[in-house]
Amino acid sequence: MTATGPRNGTDAVDVVALGESMVAFRPSRPGRLADVPSFERGIGGAESNAACVLAAAGHSVRWVSRVGADGFGDHLVAAIGSWGVDVGAVGRDPDRPTGVYFRTAGDRATDAHEVAYYRAGSAAAAMSPDTVDTAALRACRVLHLSGITAALSAGCLRLLRELTAPGPGRPLISFDVNFRPALWRDADGPRVLLELARRADLVFVGDDEA
């Protein structure tokens, strides 16, 4: 894929992707997190990954999220924008950090690996109908969401419920279930994800989630 320049604006686009992206640190060589001496910086986020791929394929795409007013937030916005994704609706939070995570290389035979997330209290976890530009979210043909966002906080879940509620002018809803048990603070995860999936027009689900 060839990176292009960032797009910014509030005009209608083909696809809007809403979700947290984090700075990803991957080891310079195989080994446990306790033993690896150095890491290479990248980015990670199911929704922003989809946005970058769609933009590279020629679609007009907007990524909506919140990042910290920090260097990691700057890196995420610049990296995702370099694929031609509209990043003009990404909010900056002066009080909460950008999330990061560390991941070891997977075992070739079993894909076993370690992941350490540092996302609790992140800027993206503070997303809600009050902190996100909902007009920018609705100005599209397709709105792409995921179950990860629903698990981040009560405000994030409230935002997804508002966006998926039936009503005139609602864009087509694309929903990636993306069930991550460790993110849910109670046993309501499957019930909430089923509720959101039933509201969606297009649902992506893995074999282990069906």
Q: PLM features: what roles do these ranges have?
A:
Residues 2-5, 87-88, 129-132, 161, ...:
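A generic local structural motif
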Residues 60-147, 173:
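Conserved N-terminal subdomain of the carbohydrate kinase-like
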Residues 42-49, 127-129, 185-188:
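Short secondary-structure boundary/capping elements
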